[in-house]
Amino acid sequence: MFHQTFNDKKLKNIKSKVTKMIDNIKYSFKKLINEKEWIDKKTKHYAFKKLNSMRSLFYDMKNYTLKEMETLYDHLRFTNESTFEEAKESLKTFDVLLTKKKKLLNKLSLTSLFQPNAAYKLTENRISYNLGIFMKPYFDEKLPMSFNYGGLGYIIGHEITHGFDDDGSQYSEDGKKFNWWSDEEKKIFQEKSNRFIEQYNKNVEKVSGYNVNGTLTLSENIADNGGVKAAFNAYRKYLNELGRDELKIPGYEKYSNEQLFFIAYSQLYCSSFTFASTYYLMMNDPHSPDRFRVLTTLGNQKSFSDAFKCKVGSKMNPKDKVVIWKTGK
């Protein structure tokens, strides 16, 4: 399955494009920080240091060639006559050899190879990307970059923002606990965070009838809002460098580049859950329900209301938008 889906040339092209996207989104996020009037020069220095030191960890595919995998699987020898202990010993040997072969397996497991996921680890200031995140609906080489920035770009921006959310902002560039914010800045950040809590607390999930827990979901809500903003600004930078509109996709001709970006983001959270699943997620999941990851997040984005010309004061263009990472104050 792996080698039918990917090959060395394709992986190299994907990594090249994604690395460029990461650089653009980091640049975009750096501008968001630099424009903050409530953050002083000393704090900005630490923030830039952390952002510049933030690493990206991809799977090293050289260790997963067909020949290498066949050699490893030769150690998995089972017959009808094999005892349980023999089978267990064979699996143990395979696991040891595989771990030795792949030094990164302690950070990225083989079983999650195709899971579409990325994760920020604050104690290492590192974002890990599973291979599945480089496939639809997050990324596709054949689609315009509006889809890729709205999908994977948002994911990248989301994880970067975690480095500066209510938890990540307490850690340094090398992943150690460090207070690099002034008391006044922490107070302002907390005030802005409280506004997010209040906003999301008002959201009522239709299936369960429960209100969203804005405190439980705070970090993810900050990351959603900051991630979309950083990715969109990075996409605009890409368009400026391109010097023209992207090619249109049949069936989507009526949408602008900017609108396609937000459509790509929104379709990531097209979902349906049972009452039991919804109830469990509402009580335990640090993410807001998918509906509000789209509607509330985009309602806070001026770029969204500008792109779709939403009426001022409407649900998708409220006068009082809640933001942490925006131009100026």
Predicted regions and their residues:
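Intrinsically disordered, low-complexity linker/terminal regions across diverse proteins
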Residues: F2-K329
